[in-house]
C-alpha cells in the first residue's frame, strides 16, 4: 500500500482510448482522474472511489474543480471500508457545505461503524448507551432519556422486548430518548421514531442456517439508522420535539428462550401467538409503537431490518417503504430524492391486516400459509400496534442497510443509507 497522497481530479472528458472504452478512471503523473458522463455522476464517483480503494490507495486529496458537497460525499461513500485506515484531504467548500460534510462524517460513519460492530462487542444495553452518546455529542442540552432493562421490562409490561430478549445472558433494553430543544417540558411531540435493535439474531428456536445468520450482527440496523437520522436532523437545526424508542434485545436459544406456541399479551390488549421465533423484530417493535402512539405525535416512523422478503423484492439497493398515508409516503420519497438515496414503496392494504390468523390469539406473528407477501404482512402486523395507523405512520424495511460482500459502489458491511432521508423528512415536517 502506498503512503503517498494521491491527487484525485474530475473530468467531463472521456479517458484516452488506451484506458479502454468508457473507462471510469485513468492515471497520469498528476494522479488519478475520474471521467464523468452525463448519467449518474454521483454514482460514477462512488464506483471510481471503490476502484481507487481496491488498488491499495488509502491517502488521497480531492483536487481541481467540481468537488462540491455531494461529489465529495459520493467519493467517501465508495472509498470508505470496514477495515484499514483511509484519509482524505477535502477540497475547499463553502462554510455551510463544509459543516454539513463534517456532520455526515461524524454521524453516518457512526451508523456504519455501529452496524458493523461484532455482536460480542455490542449488546442491547451498549447499543442504547452508544445512541445516547451520539445524540449528546450533537445536542446534549436537548436530550433526556430513560433506559428500562431486564425484569423491569416484564414488570412494566413491555411484553415483546422482554419475551424476545429473555433467552440471552445480556438483558433486553428499551431506550426512550426525548429530544426536546424547545426547553418546554410540555411541548408537543412532532414525531416518534421506533427502531428495531436486535443486536444478534440467531432465529431463536426457529434457528437460522449459518449462511443466513452470519450477518445478523447487523439486525440492529433500523435502530442505528433512526438514531443517526435524529442526530443529523438535530445537527441541521431541528427545533421541534422528537422521541426516539430503541427496542433492543438478543434473539438467542436457551432454556429461557421463548418457544413456538407461546402467546404474548401486549399493553394495548392485543394477543400474539408465536409460530416463528425468527419473526422477532415485529414483536419488539410492537412495544415501541404502543409507546409512540401514546404521544399523539402527527408522525411515527419505524425502521427495521425486518424481512428477507423486502430484500428479495428490492435487493440491497433500495429501502422498502410501507404506509397507508399516500401524502406522507410521497413526502418521504421526495426527501429521499433530495438526499440522493433510494427508497421504493411496496404494497400495504387493509386486507393484509387480516392475513395473520391464529387459532389461539388475536394475531399470529407470521402470515398464514396462503399469504406469501411477507414484507407486506409484516408491515400489517405492526399496524395493529399503531393507534391511528391509516394516517401519519411510515414503516421502513431496511433492505439497503447492510451488504454481505462488496459491490462496485460499496464495500462489504453497512451503508448508512436512510439516515439523510429521515433527517430531511423530519426537518420538512417541522416547517409545516
Swiss-Prot record:
SUPFAM superfamilies: Zn-dependent exopeptidases. Mn(2+) 1 binds at residues 201, 278, 280. Keywords: Aminopeptidase, Cytoplasm, Hydrolase, Manganese, Metal-binding, Protease. GO terms for cellular component: cytoplasm. GO terms for biological process: proteolysis. Mn(2+) 2 binds at residues 196, 201, 219, 280. InterPro entries: Leucine_aapep/pepB, M17_PepB-like_N, Pept_M17_PepB, Peptidase_M17_C. Its cofactor is Mn(2+). GO terms for molecular function: manganese ion binding; metalloaminopeptidase activity. Belongs to the peptidase M17 family. NCBIfam families: PRK05015.1. This is Peptidase B. The gene is pepB.
Amino acid at each position: 500500500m502506498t503512503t503517498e497522497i494521491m491527487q484525485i481530479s474530475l473530468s467531463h472528458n472521456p479517458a484516452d482510448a488506451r484506458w479502454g472504452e468508457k473507462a471510469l478512471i485513468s492515471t497520469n503523473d498528476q494522479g488519478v482522474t475520474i471521467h464523468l458522463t452525463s448519467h449518474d455522476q454521483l454514482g460514477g464517483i462512488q464506483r471510481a472511489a471503490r476502484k481507487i480503494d481496491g488498488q491499495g490507495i488509502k491517502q488521497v486529496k480531492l483536487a481541481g474543480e467540481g468537488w462540491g458537497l455531494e461529489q465529495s460525499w459520493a467519493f467517501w461513500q465508495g472509498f470508505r471500508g470496514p477495515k484499514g485506515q483511509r484519509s482524505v484531504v477535502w477540497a475547499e467548500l463553502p462554510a455551510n457545505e463544509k459543516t454539513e460534510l463534517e456532520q455526515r462524517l461524524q454521524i453516518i460513519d457512526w451508523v456504519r461503524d455501529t452496524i458493523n460492530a461484532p455482536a460480542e462487542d455490542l449488546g442491547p444495553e451498549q447499543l442504547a448507551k452508544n445512541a445516547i452518546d451520539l445524540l449528546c455529542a450533537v445536542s446534549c442540552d436537548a436530550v433526556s432519556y430513560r433506559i428500562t432493562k431486564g425484569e423491569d421490562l416484564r414488570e412494566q409490561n413491555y411484553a415483546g422486548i422482554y419475551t424476545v430478549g429473555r433467552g440471552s445472558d445480556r438483558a433486553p433494553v428499551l431506550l426512550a430518548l426525548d429530544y426536546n430543544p424547545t426547553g418546554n417540558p410540555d411541548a408537543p411531540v412532532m414525531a416518534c421514531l421506533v427502531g428495531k435493535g436486535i443486536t444478534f439474531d440467531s432465529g431463536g428456536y426457529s434457528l437460522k442456517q449459518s449462511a443466513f445468520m452470519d450477518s445478523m450482527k447487523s439486525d440492529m440496523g433500523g435502530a442505528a439508522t433512526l438514531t443517526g437520522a435524529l442526530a443529523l436532523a438535530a445537527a441541521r437545526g431541528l427545533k421541534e420535539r422528537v422521541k426516539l424508542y430503541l427496542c433492543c434485545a438478543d434473539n438467542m436459544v436457551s432454556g429461557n428462550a421463548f418457544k413456538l406456541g407461546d402467546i404474548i399479551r401486549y399493553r394495548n390488549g392485543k394477543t400474539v401467538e408465536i409460530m416463528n421465533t425468527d419473526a422477532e423484530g415485529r414483536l419488539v417493535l410492537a412495544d415501541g409503537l404502543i409507546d409512540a402512539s401514546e404521544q399523539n405525535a402527527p408522525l411515527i416512523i419505524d425502521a427495521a431490518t425486518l424481512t428477507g422478503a423486502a430484500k428479495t423484492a428490492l435487493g440491497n439497493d433500495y429501502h422498502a417503504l410501507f404506509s397507508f398515508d399516500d401524502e406522507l409516503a410521497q413526502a418521504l420519497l421526495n426527501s429521499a430524492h433530495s438526499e440522493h438515496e433510494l427508497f421504493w414503496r411496496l404494497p400495504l392494504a387493509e386486507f393484509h391486516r387480516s392475513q395473520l390468523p391464529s387459532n389461539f390469539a388475536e394475531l399470529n406473528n407470521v402470515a398464514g400459509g396462503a399469504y406469501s407477501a411477507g414484507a407486506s404482512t409484516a408491515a400489517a402486523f405492526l399496524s395493529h400496534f399503531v393507534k391511528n395507523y391509516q394516517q401519519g405512520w411510515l414503516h421502513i424495511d431496511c433492505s439497503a442497510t447492510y451488504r454481505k460482500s462488496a459491490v462496485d459502489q460499496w464495500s462489504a458491511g453497512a451503508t448508512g443509507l436512510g439516515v439523510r432521508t429521515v433527517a430531511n423528512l423530519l426537518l420538512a415536517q417541522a416547517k409545516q
